[in-house]
Amino acid sequence: MTTEKIDNITVQTQANVYFGGKCISHGITLADGTKKSVGVILPASLSFSTGAAEVMECVGGACEYKLSGADDWVMSSAGERFSVPGNSTFDIRVAPGFDAYHYICHFA
């Protein structure tokens, strides 16, 4: 099931813009203090580093990802999630001509 809305949040109004605008996100804080980000990745191939573990939830579009040390790319589309260990890296790509990848990043 895809998350369609999140109630009772505080939104950081200043966007986080990465990779020349290919990835744009906003930080959110839930009423219980839990932090997440919601964003979009436009067609591109990008590499990210994590501090804390993350769960990436696709809420629209699709991407392929490859975790650090993995050989194969894995597809993720709306309603699917993938986990990224803390203190690691992962690659993500959205193919040209495909819809943007819309996501919620759940921090551990």
Each language-model region and where it sits:
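Short histidine-centered beta-strand/loop micro-motifs
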Residues: 38-40, 46-51, 67, 73-75, ...
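Short acidic-glycine-tyrosine-enriched beta hairpin
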Residues: 70-90
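Ligand-binding loop in jelly-roll beta-barrel domains
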Residues: 85-108
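Short, conserved beta-strand element in jelly-roll/cupin
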Residues: 50-65
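A generic structural motif
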Residues: 29-31, 66-68, 93, 106
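A short, N-terminal "cap"/entry segment at the start of jelly-roll beta-barrel domains
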Residues: 1-34
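Short, surface-exposed charged micro-motifs
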Residues: 27, 55, 81, 91
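Conserved short histidine dyad/triad with adjacent acidic residue
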Residues: 29-51, 81-86
